[in-house]
């Protein structure tokens, strides 16, 4: 059998999702979470994980019946048909990858500059962010071999590094540091942080985007989604307990750009700082490469043409040559315009809107795909509530980010209305795999 026809096993699919999730947040926005949630950070990860499991319920039911690399857009298209909303959400899906690139760029700069003892200023941060995106854009332009096969080993390295961090940290933990803070302000901070940290689990969606290439998708897609979320939740909570249990929360907040590397110093010394920094750069780089090379490729095709071939190979580059450049350039723009918390909040908001429509699609198709209506309704209410909390938090803390979120949604909707009218594009049923 040729390699290109080889299906992903259950654990290869799990490793792919775990790799995206861990690369997206535990290194990049850990400091942001410490700033907002304080010592309630472990509970924040648990809360965010529960949100993700509620969304995953709809993903598993839909993904088992609707097999497509178009992922959530295929679900939404099946439920509400081809219209402006479906088109706008396809562009929003692409934008989620664009903003994720910005998140990775900011995370990379946060660990890279302290590692090389470079001054942390606006200029150096901007140059690093532009440089890392440009590097992976060039890498993908010239092509990349066996990215998928390497992902399993990349994830293994990340988990080993974080496993060492958790094990060593738990041995030297200060129990008083990890006692939850039940003051009203601390509890509200935990809830607000959980809304932002929702993005920590966003990677599970990559499983449905690759469902055509997974062995026995009707059985393995649901399993892979739930297993990957639970693994990542366990890792996140362990890392959070080890970090806040060894470093006073004030010091952790002060080191927000590379919080995990600084948190490793008390129990692993300078070697720990070096190891975590290198692990972070390795992890963020692999996540950025996967996002540019894989996810954004599929998402851009959907946003531009509204269709995918039945077997959209990961090795097929952007169907339109401008896709790579536009995706990367917009990623840099978001990185330069917003701080880490801003980028994280916009990313979470974008994903939550897509998730809301996925849950709505599940409700519409429930007789066809199965599931319990009360769970679907409860999931929709919870995710909607978390989305509104995120908007409220940004309204009271950072109006620029709030307006950035609103502008993203309005801009996407206006673009779709104009684009659809000019090009007459429609969504094709090619996004579904005929069984």
From Swiss-Prot:
Keywords, comma-separated and alphabetical: Cell membrane, Membrane, Transmembrane, Transmembrane helix
Plastid is among the record's keywords: no
Molecular function terms, GO-annotated: transmembrane transporter activity
Membrane-topology descriptor: Multi-pass membrane protein
Coiled-coil residue windows: none
Keyword Isomerase part of the UniProt annotation: no
Gene Ontology CC annotation, any one: plasma membrane
Pfam families per the UniProt record, alphabetical: AA_permease_2
Protein location: Cell membrane
Main localization (coarse): membrane
Transmembrane segments: 14-34, 44-64, 84-104, 123-143, 153-173, 187-207, 224-244, 267-287, 324-344, 346-366, 375-395, 400-420
Range of residues in the leader sequence: none
Protein name in UniProt: Uncharacterized protein MJ0609
Organism: Methanocaldococcus jannaschii (strain ATCC 43067 / DSM 2661 / JAL-1 / JCM 10045 / NBRC 100440) (Methanococcus jannaschii)
Lineage, highest ranks first: Archaea, Methanobacteriati, Methanobacteriota, Methanomada group, Methanococci
């Amino acid at each position: 059998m040729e390699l290109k026809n080889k299906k992903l096993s259950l654990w290869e699919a799990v490793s792919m999702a775990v790799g995206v999730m861990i690369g997206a947040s535990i290194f990049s926005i850990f400091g942001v979470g410490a700033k907002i949630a304080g010592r309630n950070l472990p509970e924040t990860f648990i809360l965010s994980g529960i949100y993700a499991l509620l969304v995953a319920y709809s993903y598993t039911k839909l993904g088992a019946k609707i097999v497509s690399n178009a992922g959530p857009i295929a679900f939404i298209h099946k439920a509400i048909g081809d219209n402006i909303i479906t088109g706008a959400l396809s562009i929003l899906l692409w934008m989620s990858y664009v903003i994720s690139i910005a998140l990775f760029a900011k995370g990379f700069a946060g660990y890279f500059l302290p590692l090389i003892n470079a001054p942390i200023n606006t200029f150096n941060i901007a140059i690093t962010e532009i440089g890392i995106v440009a590097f992976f854009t060039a890498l993908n332009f010239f092509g990349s071999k066996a990215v998928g096969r390497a992902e399993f080993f990349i994830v293994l390295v990340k988990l080993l590094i974080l496993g060492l961090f958790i094990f060593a940290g738990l041995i030297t933990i200060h129990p008083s540091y990890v006692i939850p803070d039940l003051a009203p302000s601390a509890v509200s901070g935990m809830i607000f942080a959980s809304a932002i940290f929702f993005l920590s689990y966003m990677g599970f969606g990559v499983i449905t985007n690759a469902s055509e290439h997974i062995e026995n998708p009707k059985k393995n897609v649901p399993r892979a989604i739930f297993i990957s979320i639970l693994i990542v939740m366990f890792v996140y909570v362990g890392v959070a307990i080890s970090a806040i249990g060894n470093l006073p929360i004030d010091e952790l907040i002060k080191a927000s750009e590379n919080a995990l590397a600084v948190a490793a110093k008390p129990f692993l010394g300078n070697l720990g700082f070096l190891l975590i920094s290198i692990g972070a750069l390795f992890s963020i780089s692999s996540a950025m490469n996967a996002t540019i090379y894989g996810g954004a490729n599929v998402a851009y095709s959907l946003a531009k043409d509204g269709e995918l071939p039945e077997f959209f190979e990961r090795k097929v580059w952007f169907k339109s040559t401008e896709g790579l450049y536009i995706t990367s350039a917009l990623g840099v723009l978001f990185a330069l315009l917003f701080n880490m918390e801003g980028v994280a909040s916009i990313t979470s908001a974008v994903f939550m809107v897509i998730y809301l429509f996925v849950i709505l699609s599940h409700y519409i198709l429930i007789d066809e795909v199965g599931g319990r209506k009360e769970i679907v309704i409860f999931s929709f209410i919870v995710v909607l509530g978390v989305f509104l909390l995120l908007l409220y938090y940004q309204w009271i803390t950072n109006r620029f980010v709030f307006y950035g979120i609103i502008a993203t949604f309005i801009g996407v909707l206006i673009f779709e209305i104009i684009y659809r009218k000019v090009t007459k594009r429609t969504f094709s049923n090619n996004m579904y795999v005929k069984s």
